[in-house]
Amino acid sequence: METKDLKKLAKAELHCHLDGSLSLDTIRQLAALAQVDVPQDDSELKQLVTAPETCESLMDYLKTFDVIRPLLQTPQALTLAAYDVVKQAALENVIYIEIRFAPELSMDQGLTATQVVEAVLKGLEQGQKEFGIVAKAIVCGMRQSSLDISREIFANVLEWANKGLVGFDFAGNELDFPPAVLADLIKETQAYGLPFTLHAGECGCPNYIVDAIDLGIKRLGHVTAIHNQKDLLAKFIANDVTAELCFTSNLQTKAARTVEDFPYMQLRQAGAKLSINTDNRTVSDTNLTKEYELFVKHFETSVTDFLEHNRDAIKASFASPAEKEALLDRLDKAYQSYIKK
């Protein structure tokens, strides 16, 4: 398929980080509000906020976020940022998106976690009204932070449950802070009733995927370490888990050292449920259309495959049953003309 056709395809995205996905124009706008100097030249600014094509590691990749953190410290900034990412998604025919963020990273200047979530939800709501997209929020804890900080944040933001906030996650340094370290807090938080997704297997540790599945988590981000792990793949499928794949990001961070190391083909051939995602649109210099192009190029992914992956994404989403039903209907209708070709 040509790029213009891939762009027209209806899409769903489950794994997109707010702070890693801001457009250059919005970064400039936020920098002006925060009175932070950033380059006016696009190429210079892009170099500042985009990770190298090949990083030394995940932690090397995550350094890029340090530039954005000071820009997301006010309600106005967070609302603008959320609206910006929804707009970017809608312009490439994303009909459903879950945008994740860590309130902790926007509390440097006195905002509470509740205020951070409220501001993000306001931006999502503006984007939904303007573009006809469904956009939800996932709150992340930071693995390397004190568990007490994450515990307090998760408890405090519950007032936004099912008002746009639909789930929780842990992001950050997976290697040193595996699921076992987080297990008790994850179980506590699951008791609140909102679902969990979890970054798992991004750092090359298959056992972390096992641990996440054993915690009853039904959506896992990246899962690159599942590659060539037949027993783990069988467990993944038996437990009805959906993979949130992030191809460009995984090559950058060396989670997958080569295209051949990326687990998509093994997941697809085994019948596992999966979704295609950007992870960080700006930090990885990508969007969903670019990701789809890469899947066509490297894996010969077909329109029928894309429909199936998007159906998997919507079914595994944290949207309400009624929203899922409407989104699946919208998705199927959008693909009819392409499937017939």
UniProtKB/Swiss-Prot annotation:
**Which amino acids does the record list as binding substrate?**
H17, D19, G172
Q: Mind telling me which HAMAP family this protein's record contains?
A: A_deaminase
What organism does the record attribute this protein to?
Streptococcus equi subsp. zooepidemicus (strain H70)
Q: Which domain of life is it from?
A: Bacteria
UniProt keywords (A-Z) are:
Hydrolase, Metal-binding, Nucleotide metabolism, Zinc
Which reaction equations make up its catalytic activity? Answer: adenosine + H2O + H(+) = inosine + NH4(+); 2'-deoxyadenosine + H2O + H(+) = 2'-deoxyinosine + NH4(+)
Residues of the signal peptide: none
Reported function: Catalyzes the hydrolytic deamination of adenosine and 2-deoxyadenosine.
Residue(s) at site: Important for catalytic activity: H222
Gene Ontology biological process terms in this record: adenosine catabolic process; hypoxanthine salvage; inosine biosynthetic process; nucleotide metabolic process; purine ribonucleoside monophosphate biosynthetic process
Q: What is this protein called?
A: Adenosine deaminase
